[in-house]
């Protein structure tokens, strides 16, 4: 699954790097019938104390989402998603460029985000 995620993210970043803004966030969505998706956004603002920092979108992949089906609960999906993103931030094509942003995070759009790195 990581390979497909990395291909999706590489394609997005090939077309859009450098992303505008100061921080990045991976929005995770629960779709229907155990389908899940991830959207990349960049934000004009970052403050770890402000839980809405990722609402200040400067860039978004919009409907171009990474999607998959998996029969597990949302907690496991959050773990799996963060693990894929951390792996990309370690070995992905744009890992070093993404880590130049103030922070990178991931989380469900209706919940808290997990800070994956800070600069």
Placement of each model-derived feature along the sequence:
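N-terminal interaction modules that seed assembly of large macromolecular complexes
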Residues: 19-46
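Intrinsically disordered, low-complexity regulatory segments enriched in Ser/Thr/Pro
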Residues: 36-72, 117
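Acidic, proline/glycine-rich low-complexity IDRs
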Residues: 3-18, 33, 46-51, 59, ...
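Short, surface-exposed tryptophan/glycine-enriched loops
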Residues: 71-80
